[in-house]
């Protein structure tokens, strides 16, 4: 199985805090770390650990972080030949605060991620054509996302699009994805709605009406909503005590993509994705928390979760 991830590569600068600061407040932090991240890189590492032959198309800076990021991806089993360094450009950086409950706030400076162009994607057309699925996110320029989706459609490769972080205005290309995987805030943003103004099921229905083949909406502790032309089903979450939720959605998306390629029923695929996301919450850091296929299988074997309508 071949997965091509087209997306961001960041260095995460992470600190723990008791609570998130409000405007004008100083808070004490501790356990400061630099950890490889970026939604694209996280999803590539997750897919590789879950057993897929995974290639990442992305850009890093010609700085110390760029070298570390590429080496870390290679060590995780990701094929890095399509990752290039942009001269004179810094690598992308994410500043992450994690509170006592394991919840996070993130500020991203895109750096070289903003230099991944439609021309770069066109040059990677052979990689798109030979992939079993292309996985994308929105931490790279919207025109680059649109180009990747368009080429994938031309060559018949399915696309799984993680709609984070949300962008305005919304590029209509995301609605042509084979599977669209937003969380609730991202779903609302895609529809031009205020966060919390619609329930998860309604958001999934409304997104499906915009054109994607299916919607798998990530609803955190309330599981996932799967919507396609035949049904709408809620897939319950697994109850855990999170340490760090930073890359749970990335683990979810990678696992979902792999199960989709295998031909697994989408609701069953979402259950496996929920398990991968839950496991990713049990360790600090993005890429270090990505589970292996064996860990997901073991976790599922110890659970009793069923589908509910």
Model-assigned labels for residue ranges:
Residues 1-59, 64-75, 242-243, 309:
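Glycine-rich phosphate/adenosyl-contacting loop at the front of the ribokinase-like
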Residues 3-4, 167-168, 172-173, 198-309:
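Conserved phosphate-binding/catalytic region of the ribokinase-like
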Residues 45-53, 98, 259-263:
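Alpha-helix C-terminal capping segments
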Residues 59, 82-86, 96-133, 138:
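Conserved phosphate-binding/catalytic loop of the ribokinase/pfkB sugar-kinase fold
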Residues 72-88:
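A glycine-rich helix N-cap at a beta->alpha junction
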Residues 125-129, 174-175, 209:
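A short, aliphatic-rich alpha-helical micro-motif
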Residues 133-202, 222-223:
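Conserved beta-alpha-beta core of the PfkB/ribokinase-like small-molecule kinase fold
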